[in-house]
């Protein structure tokens, strides 16, 4: 199934077979966001999915690992707590940039969660 990220203007696909394997093909979220794991060192906050941008890597992105995506989708559908995605706020416009949690981010967008648990952390280029 094709999905569209409304503020980044790109399409991404999660195959129907993956959605069915995760029992996510008819999922309707009852909560604003997937359930985050509590981390006292790096607390998370719920952020509107439209406020998150990502670093674009390579032509034809995004590419997902099937086992990882099915696992993430399944956990979101079951309500299993997952780590918040990591973002930094280091763009001139102050937008949040996705740094870690690409599968969780795209799964949440595909499942139509309005908010995403985000842990805002500094980003360092190595």
Task: Identify the residue ranges that each predicted region occupies.
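Short alpha-helix boundary/capping and kink motifs at helix termini
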Residues: 37-99, 109
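An acidic, glycine-rich, mixed-charge low-complexity segment common to nucleic-acid enzymes
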Residues: 1-66
């Amino acid at each position: 199934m094709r999905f569209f990220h409304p503020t980044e203007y790109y399409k991404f696909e999660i195959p129907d077979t993956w959605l069915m394997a995760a029992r996510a093909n008819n999922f309707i979220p009852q909560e604003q966001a997937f359930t985050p794991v509590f981390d006292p060192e790096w607390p998370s906050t719920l952020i509107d999915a439209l406020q998150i941008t990502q670093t674009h890597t390579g032509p034809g992105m995004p590419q997902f690992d099937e086992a990882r995506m099915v696992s993430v989708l399944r956990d979101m559908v079951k309500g299993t707590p997952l780590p918040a995605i990591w973002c930094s706020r280091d763009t001139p416009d102050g937008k949040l940039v996705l740094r870690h949690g690409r599968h969780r981010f795209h799964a949440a967008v595909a499942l139509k969660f309005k908010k995403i648990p985000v842990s805002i952390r500094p980003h360092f280029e190595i």
